[in-house]
A protein has these predicted regions:
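Extracellular, repeat-based ectodomains that mediate carbohydrate processing or recognition
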Residues: 1-225
Length: 225
C-alpha cells in the first residue's frame, strides 16, 4: 500500500548573496494522505539539493469540502521573503450540502485566496492565528468589487429571462507571488453566480489582481488584503 503520493508540486527559490547560499523550498499535494507537504533545503551544493523532513503545511482538516480548494503554490525572493498559498474554503463550509458553519462562518463562507508568509526562506511561516495561520482575502474586499456589478443578468438571450446575482465563483486558475519587498500579489478569476449558472459579464468578470503591503497584515481579519 502506498503511504505517500506526492503529486502536484510548486518550488520557491531564493539566493542569499551575502552568505552565498541557495535556498529551495517545495510544496506537494499528497493524493494518498490529503493535505500539502512542505520541504525546505538543508544544503544546496554542487548541483545537489538536500531536503529536510516534510512538514504538513496545509492541513486538510482546516479546509472545507474536499475538492473545492486548490493545491498550494510557493513564491520566494532573494531576501528570504516568501508566500505559500491556496485558493480555497475554510473548514465548516460544506459546498455539496450548501451549508456553512463555524469556523468558516466566523471567517468567510466564500472561496477565497489564503496564504502564509515567511521571512527566512521557508524555515518558518506566519499568518492569521484566528484562521489556521492563514491570511485571507475577506468578504469586504469582494463587496467593494461587486458594488459595480449589476444586480441581475440575462441568462437567456432568446427570451430575455434574467436572474439575480447571488455571489461569485473562482476557478482554479490563479497565481500568488511576492515582489522584491516581500509584498503578496494575488491573481484570481471571478465569475458571476446565479441560482442556476455561472456567467461572464463584460467588463466585470475575469481576472483580478489583489495586493497589500506585508507590513499592513495583522493577526485579525480586518487587516487582511
Amino acid at each position: 500500500v502506498c503511504q505517500k503520493d506526492l503529486w502536484t508540486g510548486s518550488v520557491g527559490y531564493g539566493y542569499d548573496g551575502t552568505a552565498n547560499e541557495h535556498h529551495v523550498s517545495v510544496v506537494y499535494d499528497d493524493w494518498t494522505r490529503d493535505g500539502n507537504y512542505l520541504f525546505t533545503s538543508e544544503a544546496v551544493e554542487d548541483g545537489y539539493i538536500i531536503l529536510g523532513t516534510e512538514t504538513l503545511i496545509v492541513n486538510p482538516a482546516h479546509l472545507g469540502t474536499t475538492g473545492y480548494s486548490s493545491t498550494a503554490i510557493l513564491s520566494m525572493n532573494d531576501n528570504g521573503q516568501g508566500l505559500l498559498g491556496i485558493d480555497g474554503i475554510f473548514a465548516g463550509n460544506d459546498m455539496d450540502a450548501g451549508t456553512c458553519g463555524p469556523p468558516a462562518s466566523n471567517l468567510t463562507c466564500n472561496k477565497t485566496p489564503m496564504f502564509k508568509l515567511t521571512d527566512n526562506y521557508g524555515q518558518s511561516w506566519a499568518g492569521n492565528h484566528a484562521a489556521f495561520d492563514f491570511y485571507y482575502v475577506p468578504d469586504a474586499v469582494f463587496d467593494d468589487i461587486f458594488e459595480s456589478w449589476p444586480n441581475n443578468v440575462v441568462i437567456d438571450n432568446c427570451t430575455g429571462a434574467t436572474e439575480d446575482l447571488c455571489g461569485y465563483w473562482s476557478w482554479y486558475e490563479f497565481d500568488m507571488r511576492v515582489d522584491n519587498e516581500g509584498n503578496p500579489h494575488i491573481v484570481i478569476s471571478l465569475l458571476a453566480e446565479t441560482q442556476s449558472s455561472l456567467l461572464t459579464i463584460s467588463g466585470k468578470t475575469g481576472f483580478y489582481h489583489l495586493t497589500i503591503d506585508r507590513d499592513m497584515l495583522g493577526n485579525d481579519h480586518d487587516d487582511n488584503p
